[in-house]
């Protein structure tokens, strides 16, 4: 049984008998999925493998970039250009949509003259601003390059529309990881791997955030060695929060009620909706890539127009 419901409300979002289909395997640690609607393909990262790959129905899995600077989270801007969090360079970069690395430009690499830790996950707002988390995972062996940390905190940042120096939004996370907007962008959700919880903030008109509070906690152990961690996170079109955690993808209501879990047979790193009607949930999980049919879609993002 792949769907374990704590509330019948979950079955409005995903069928009780939904199949978890493995569509690729043989990787090291998969992350950062992003669906390209113009080309009808999914890009995803393999950090320890230092590789970026592509999946589509015709060709299945192909390699598009190796090395990839151990890229992690990815998204697209309104023009369809790929935005990548790179662990090796401690940078947020933008490149051509195919992910091969052409047209690469650095959007953020330092804060107040100090190197960022290792940008992890990223989201683009409708005004063109880019928000990203900056934990230290990419300064650990395997997931990046082991090296000393220059900043003395782990923050969440905003790159203003049109570019510019990153603006610090919050600095009191232990390891900020997944982040996502509510459908109307009035709220920003950020999870903290070490604290095993999700916090939600109000978005202000100037791009800052306020009134941070815990939405849900107890999502995993916070222990990196256990692999039972809160990680990637997305909102669907109705405002439900889907987040990776122990044993699969956990689903919460906008008020924080736990609805249940879509069980995945490997440790899960992230998730993203895609496919012709945006109802397929793609789930990279350790050595494999999975997909699940849902009854909902991801929130409407700028690149979907």
Walk through the language-model features, giving the residues of each.
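Short, conserved, GDST-rich strand-edge loop motifs in beta-rich repeat architectures
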Residues: 132-151, 294
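Beta-rich, blade/repeat-based domains predominating
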Residues: 25-40, 67-86, 91, 112-130, ...
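A short beta-strand motif characteristic of beta-propeller blades
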Residues: 19-24, 59-65, 105-112, 165-171, ...
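Short loop/turn segments immediately following the C-termini of beta-strands
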Residues: 47, 87, 135-137, 193, ...
């Amino acid at each position: 049984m792949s769907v374990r419901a704590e509330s019948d409300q979950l079955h409005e979002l995903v069928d009780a008998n939904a199949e978890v289909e493995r569509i690729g395997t043989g990787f090291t640690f998969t992350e950062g999925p992003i669906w390209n609607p113009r080309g009808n393909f999914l890009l995803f990262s393999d950090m320890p493998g230092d590789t970026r790959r592509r999946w589509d129905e015709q060709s299945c899995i192909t390699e598009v970039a190796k090395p990839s600077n151990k890229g992690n989270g990815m998204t697209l801007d309104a023009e369809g250009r790929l935005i990548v969090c790179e662990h090796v360079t401690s940078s947020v970069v933008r490149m051509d949509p195919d992910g091969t690395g052409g047209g690469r430009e650095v959007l953020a690499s330092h804060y107040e003259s100090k190197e960022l830790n290792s940008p992890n996950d990223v989201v683009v707002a409708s005004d063109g601003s880019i928000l990203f988390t900056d934990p230290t995972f990419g300064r650990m062996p395997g997931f990046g390059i082991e090296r000393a940390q220059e900043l003395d905190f782990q923050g969440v940042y905003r790159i203003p529309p049109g570019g510019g120096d990153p603006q610090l939004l919050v600095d009191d996370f232990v390891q900020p990881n997944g982040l996502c907007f509510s459908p109307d962008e009035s709220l920003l959700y950020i999870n903290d791997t070490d604290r095993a919880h999700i916090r939600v903030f109000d978005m202000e008109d100037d791009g800052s955030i306020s009134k941070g509070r815990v939405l849900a906690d107890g999502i995993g152990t916070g222990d990196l060695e256990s692999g039972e961690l809160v990680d990637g996170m997305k909102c669907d079109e109705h405002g439900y929060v889907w987040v990776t955690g122990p044993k699969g993808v956990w689903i919460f209501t906008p008020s924080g009620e736990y609805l249940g879990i879509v069980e995945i047979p490997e440790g899960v790193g992230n998730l993203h909706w895609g496919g012709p009607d945006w109802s397929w949930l793609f789930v990279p999980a350790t050595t494999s890539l999975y997909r699940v049919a849902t009854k909902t879609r991801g929130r409407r993002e700028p690149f979907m127009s």
